[in-house]
Swiss-Prot record:
One of its GO terms (molecular function) is structural constituent of ribosome. Disulfide bonds: none annotated. Part of the 50S ribosomal subunit. The keyword Ribonucleoprotein applies. Binds 23S rRNA and is also seen to make contacts with the A and possibly P site tRNAs. GO terms for biological process: translation. InterPro entries: Ribosomal_uL16 (IPR047873), Ribosomal_uL16_bact-type (IPR000114), Ribosomal_uL16_CS (IPR020798), Ribosomal_uL16_dom (IPR016180), Ribosomal_uL16_sf (IPR036920). Keywords: Ribonucleoprotein, Ribosomal protein, RNA-binding, rRNA-binding, tRNA-binding. This is Large ribosomal subunit protein uL16. GO terms for cellular component: cytosolic large ribosomal subunit. Belongs to the universal ribosomal protein uL16 family. NCBIfam families: rplP_bact (TIGR01164).
Length: 137
């Protein structure tokens, strides 16, 4: 699963996920892309599950790029633990997603196959997505 090899700080503040995606909003590596329409956060497990679904759908042909990386740690306290006594332990990693962010790209497969693969991947994700095609090469 995806997670940073090392970080400057172990835990981060919750923060807010505002604004639109400026960087990473265009299909730049492949021909087809899966773009986020709503905001949210994708866990490393969701990113990997969608990647596996796409790889299986295209029968390991073509090439797939993952354009998001989970770099934010999410902490949780154990069950039945009283409030206080510090922040919980890091349980999983997420990538913050803004509307307009390209999540995955694909090349080397027919458009219909790419659409089917992205539809399978979109079912694994917690944000609404749309299929996009690269306009200028």
């Amino acid at each position: 699963m995806l997670q940073p090899k090392r970080t400057k700080f172990r835990k981060v503040h919750k923060g807010r996920n505002r604004g639109l995606a400026n960087a990473g909003s265009d299909v730049s590596f492949g021909t087809y892309g899966l773009k986020a329409v709503t905001r949210g956060q994708l866990t490393a497990r969701q990113i990997e599950a969608a990647r596996r679904a796409m790889t299986r759908a295209v029968k390991r042909q073509g090439k797939i790029w993952i354009r998001v990386f989970p770099d934010k740690p999410i902490t949780e306290k154990p069950l039945e633990v009283r409030m206080g006594k510090g922040k919980g332990n890091v349980e999983y990693w997420v990538a913050l997603i803004q509307p307009g962010k390209v999540l995955y790209e694909m090349d080397g497969v027919p458009e219909e196959t790419a659409r089917e693969a992205f539809a399978l991947a979109a079912a694994k994700l917690s944000v609404k997505t749309t299929f996009v095609i690269r306009t200028a090469m």
